[in-house]
From Swiss-Prot:
Species: Stenotrophomonas maltophilia (strain R551-3)
Similarity annotation: Belongs to the FPG family.
Cofactor note: Binds 1 zinc ion per subunit.
Full protein name: Formamidopyrimidine-DNA glycosylase
Active site, renumbered: P2 (schiff-base intermediate with dna), E3 (proton donor), K58 (proton donor), R260 (proton donor)
GO process terms (BP): base-excision repair
Length: 270
């Protein structure tokens, strides 16, 4: 599933082509995605100018005066800006045509993505109750320490809780915990403020660097220009169970934590 760096890469690729453009029309070929596409998308978007392309957590928002189209890529979704006469491929479910003859095309083979509508002045229910963005100043060791008190869940599960911080999925949680030297199994409520500061710093560094590398290509993700992400080539622990730890050379451990595959070094991460 695309995580924050992949979604931010998509946003940065789309924004120059969409911001300031007016929507000419919307074609819905399949509305039965993870959630049915509401009629407001086709009813409200045409004629509206796209004022901004934003990201909140793993959602993309196309802001207009009437409201925002809220997009989630799901497991396999992709968004590309194409010439208006580009032939259809399998799983091309939605076209948003623009006033310059180009279009934004949403392709989603597995149909776990979504395209929803947020009226102006409202916050969509899916965007309510979310934690801070991990790259914002509000996300630091003090914040993690305060939120973790009394929490007995493993720190990896805690870090992936969208109510705690948004956009840190399985890949980047594993890499951040490794860089911070914290075992994913350690109880969240038993980690010191100092160690949480190291973890917050690691999350910011790894996510920021992954964005510059175009995200991580695992199976399905490609950026809007069709290029893969390159951060996968630099993963230190994720997907490397049984291989030598890049720090100490011992075999990396594997376990299921919170129903997610987890890999770590039991020597370097405590």
């Amino acid at each position: 599933m695309p995580e924050l760096p992949e979604v931010e890469t998509t946003r940065r690729g789309l924004a120059p082509h969409l911001q300031g453009r007016r929507v000419h029309g919307v074609i819905l070929r399949r509305a039965d995605l993870r959630w049915p596409i509401p009629p407001e998308v086709a009813g409200q978007l045409p004629g509206q100018r796209i004022d901004a392309v934003r990201r909140r957590a793993k959602y993309l928002l196309l802001d207009t005066a009437a409201g925002s189209a809220v997009l989630h890529l799901g497991m396999s979704g992709s968004l590309r800006v194409l010439p208006g006469d580009t032939p259809l491929r399998a799983h091309d479910h939605v076209d948003i045509s623009l006033d310059n003859g180009r279009l934004l095309r949403f392709n989603d083979p597995r149909r776990f993505g979504s395209l929803l509508w947020q009226p102006a002045g409202e916050v969509h229910p899916l965007l309510q109750g979310l934690g801070p963005e991990p790259l914002d100043d509000a996300f630091d060791g003090n914040y993690l320490f305060a939120r973790s008190r009394g929490r007995s869940a493993p720190v990896k599960t805690f870090l992936m809780d969208q109510a705690v911080v948004v956009g840190v999925g399985n890949i980047y949680a594993a890499e951040s915990l490794f860089k911070a030297g914290i075992s994913p199994l350690r109880e969240a409520g038993k980690i010191s403020r100092e160690r949480y500061q190291r973890l917050a710093d690691a999350v910011k560094e790894i996510l920021g660097y992954a964005i510059t590398r175009g995200g991580t290509t695992l199976r399905d993700f490609i950026s809007p220009d069709g290029a893969p992400g390159y951060f996968e080539q630099e993963l230190l622990v994720y997907g490397r169970d049984g291989l030598p730890c890049p720090n100490c050379g011992r075999a990396l451990k594997h376990a299921t934590i919170g129903q997610r595959a987890s890999v770590w070094c039991s020597h370097c991460q405590r």
